[in-house]
Amino acid sequence: MLTPEENLLLCRVEGDAPMGQMMRRHWTPVCLLEEVSEPDGTPVRARLFGEDLVVFRDTDGRVGVMDEYCPHRRVSLIYGRNENSGLRCLYHGWKMDVDGNVVEMVSEPAASNMCQKVKHTAYKTREWGGFVWAYMGPQDAIPEFVPPAWAPHEHVRVSIAKAIIPCNWAQILEGAIDSAHSSSLHSSDFVPARVGGAEATSKNWLRPSTDKAPRMQVERTSYGFRYAALRRPIQNAATSEYVRSTVFVAPATALIPPNNLYNVANINVPIDDTHTAFYFMAWGNPDNTPETETWRKFLGQQVGIDLDDSYRPLRNDGNRFFQDREAMKNGNFTGIKGFPNQDIAMWVTMGPIADRSDERLGASDLAVVEFRRVMLDALAAFQAGESAIGTGEKAIPSRICSFQAIVSKDIDWRDYQARYVWALDDANIVAEPDYEVHT
């Protein structure tokens, strides 16, 4: 439980809000690469931390991320002409390059040197892992871009589903790091089976446990924390634990325990105080990791079917998230197709910014409590002049990963040699009674 004041510190990201300023000290995904794949193509609107942006790929293939509004009369550049290595405003023809230099002012006298006196707000960018990234912190102290843990090298396949969610980033992040809810909310999609660990089929994720009350243990790190949800396995319960270890990488990434085929992660990028860009990634060996559209279909996150052209879910509170009550009577736990859509329903119905002053937290909420403590402690340190969490001396290590495994009770999960999934393991699937496996 947080006080109303603490809750606002955690959630607010716009303008001078301390949390937003701290988060700006990280390279942040702005949009998908596929949204700006074409040189001289249509500019794309983006919004981060309450700041309106325009994203475009110029004639030379360089990506620009700039203030959406022209420095002349503040007209939107979304409708501008993307041509000849710059973006030209339709109103008076001012043209900016990807660095924010005003390279043409056709409405000014030929002898004018006004171009040299005006600089448009633009941010340094990188392309990696299917995203356009921007550094929106101080532009005189831009850190080197470091590939994230979920895209460690260029040979990795990264398939991304994107959705714009009408609620605050923190309640989405809390859902991502909450292992306990999956045993209930996702029980029709995460099916208990006699397997040696979590396994993926084309329709389900399987897990070797029916335990709905995991014991939680947490370990704080310099970049966030990692924790374990310990469950009784279906087999060898007397000598083993089923461990699902999730990693929170500040400020807004969760490394989710993988399955036998590929790794899973998500990033929750604050659009503003009450909207979030939720990115759900499958990544790993190209031979095992689903292609992008296959991944989106599996999740129920396809544009034109589940989302509109702006990535907003067609399922919403107004249509009850297309909940099928008849399916619920026949055994489906939620009646909502696609487990991310089940999550979205929970996040959205908490309100635009969740009220954390009237909660009743239990033992299963340990990771949620730790997330709040970590971020508020990090914010206090940042306001006192220290570097932002996950930067400087507290930089995120290059090799961190989540894991899931059946582990002997003699082994502490903290000492388990975790590695990300790359090789393909053979599956021998036997479902538990009363559960159905779709392959």
Curated annotation (Swiss-Prot):
Induction cue: Induced by phthalate and repressed by glucose.
Q: Which reaction does it catalyse?
A: phthalate + NADH + O2 + H(+) = cis-4,5-dihydroxycyclohexa-2,6-diene-1,2-dicarboxylate + NAD(+)
| Rieske domain boundaries | 27-134
Q: Which EC number(s) does UniProt give?
A: 1.14.12.7
| Sequence positions that bind [2Fe-2S] cluster | C70, H72, C89, H92
| Enzyme class, first EC level, given as a word | oxidoreductase
Q: Which domain of life is it from?
A: Bacteria
Q: Could you state a single Gene Ontology molecular function term?
A: iron ion binding
Write out the similarity annotation.
Answer: Belongs to the bacterial ring-hydroxylating dioxygenase alpha subunit family.
Protein name per the record: Phthalate 4,5-dioxygenase oxygenase subunit
Question: Which gene is transcribed and translated to give this protein?
Answer: pht3
